[in-house]
Amino acid sequence: RYMQVTGVQTCALPISIKNSIKADLESTSSLLNSDDMFQIARLLCSNPPVYLYSPAGLTDISVSYLESMLFISDCQKVYKTTASKALRHFIQTADKKSIFIFISNSGRFESTLNLAKEARLHGMIVISISSIENNDLAEVSTYNLRFFSKKRENDGADLTSRLCSFFVLSSFIEYFSFYKKGLEHENFSESD
């Protein structure tokens, strides 16, 4: 569909896509009061090593955003890698209190799934950020942050919106910040 705007023909965003994104965001927000959010915040407050896997494509943007937000939130031991061999080495040599975070829109990307399984087999804490759909990544993870997203393709190209995954990441970082402030306030009150 095209519409004429002051003499220029532009493509109008179909109402159905906007409504779909709105519904996905509203549904995703209902998932954010899970106990997993609290448990992940509690774990991160102990400042363990956090390993992020950045497999390629659009997921890299989400992983880079999470990495930046964790650094801003004063997590000092954050390690991002794009190489599966390097992450395998980290899995085999890391402390058992280490956290491995995997982001996947489908929860079925083979290299991500295999690394998450390997991390669990080595007794590591695995956190997944993935779609609410039944997916293998969520099943092997210790904790999950989930989102709604409808898969869209055009001639085989993935056009699935990543908006809800960013919404989950942003909401979690905000929650984590409030959680840490609550701990600081609690510690300050105890010292009086």
Label every model-predicted segment.
Residues 28-47:
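A short, well-structured juxtamembrane/interface segment
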Residues 27-28, 159:
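Flexible, glycine/proline-enriched loop segments at strand-loop-helix junctions
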Residues 136, 179-192:
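Internal, active-site/partner-interface "lid" segment
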Residues 22-27, 99-102:
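Short, basic, glycine/proline-bearing loop/turn elements
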Residues 2-11:
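Single conserved hydrophobic/aromatic residue that forms the stacking wall/gate
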Residues 14-23, 65-70:
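Short, basic/glycine-rich phosphate-binding loops at helix/coil junctions
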